[in-house]
Amino acid sequence: VTVSVLARTRARQWPLATAAAACLLSFIAFWVAQRLAHVNMLDVMVYRAEGETVRAGGDLYAMRATSANLAMTYPPFAGLLFVPLTFVGVPLMRTLATAGNLLLVVALVQLSLQLVRPSLSGTRLWRAALLVAAVVVWCEPVWTTLRYGQINLLIAVAVLWDFTRREGHRWAGVGIGLATAVKLTPGLFVVFLVIAGVLQWRRERRWNQWLRTAATATAVFLGTTLASALVLPYDSKRFWTETLFETGRVGFAEETANQSLRGVLARLMHTDDPGLWWLVVAVLFGAAAMALAVRAALRGDKALAVVVCAITALMVSPISWSHHWVWCVPLLVLLVDRRDRVRPRWTVGAVALVFASFALWWVPHDPGRPELDQNAGQMLLSGVYPLTIAALFVGYALTRRPQAVAKE
């Protein structure tokens, strides 16, 4: 269904009002489904507790919130951003968080379409965005993001906003800088921008869009981080010297929800710490994937470069919860747009099915940590996102190689 809607959106001339109505009906059904599922929006409750701790002048990184005893894992700047959540009651906060995330789904799709097909604009762009949003809201990463009240959609939108600005735009880089100040992982985009920018500078010997965006992102990140240090000096010192290196406070590596290479290896090796094996695999994969992203950027394929960089961050991060994978939305948009070049032809549908299937939750998962004793079939299901990406990368390499030989 997802692939069908994405593929035909451009051809079918739906009136904008009809597309908006379809999206609204889907979102209402989604809202009702989440209420019937009794979602607890656990993470937004943690965000609220972090904001309350900042207002009370407490210790951010000693704080524990909710019945799950969850700790603060983001930089101090995030705590400052969460203060406004304390100005409204919990029921209203949950409603606003859900409504805001639904709007961000539309924004994410709209920016993904702009990134992949810059010529799409005006009514055609918004019609497509609304129709696609009506479908992708039901995929597992988006569902889980709204279930917990997470900020993944906001992070992705901030990053994509930068990459869809026209060349030379003065504010390009602000989104990446702010996103990195909140969650650190988007900092890989800065690394990508610097590498691509330096290589292009060596070729042309002039300042370019990649370096400009990297400089802006770095300045925004440093500015917000320093400002946070002035407001929260103790918390800032503790985070950057201690908490940053305490990966265990985020969660167990082997958890089914951890859809990173480290999670796959932890379950494969029946351990909570895959150690050096993960580091080697992450470095090798990260280097190869970043080389692909930079190469795509230098030949003008910004969409492929951005999507590959985002996926790389998810793969090599120590913990990438399934709800972090909202980047499946621009990935699917890219695959559908280039479906004529994807082999085998059923690949696009298979990838869409992976993210819509909730397959990773089909295996035993509970506080007793059954993931440490998975069988082969359970390992395949619980590693479905990273394994799908690995298959896509291998398939891309195999299909590109014959093309390169043919050109020679």
Pin down the residues of each PLM region.
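Primarily membrane-embedded glycan-assembly and transfer machineries that use lipid-linked glycans
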Residues: 2-171, 197-322, 374-378, 401-408
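Alpha-helical transmembrane segments and their membrane-interface exit regions
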Residues: 159-162, 185, 246-248, 332-338
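Solvent-exposed, amphipathic alpha-helical segments
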Residues: 165, 190, 194-197, 201, ...
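Membrane-interface alpha helices of multi-pass inner-membrane proteins
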Residues: 170-194, 309-316
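A cytosolic-side transmembrane-helix exit/cap motif
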Residues: 173-176, 237-241, 326-330, 344-350, ...
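Hydrophobic/aromatic-rich transmembrane helices and adjacent perimembrane loops
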Residues: 322-336
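Aromatic-enriched
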Residues: 336-408
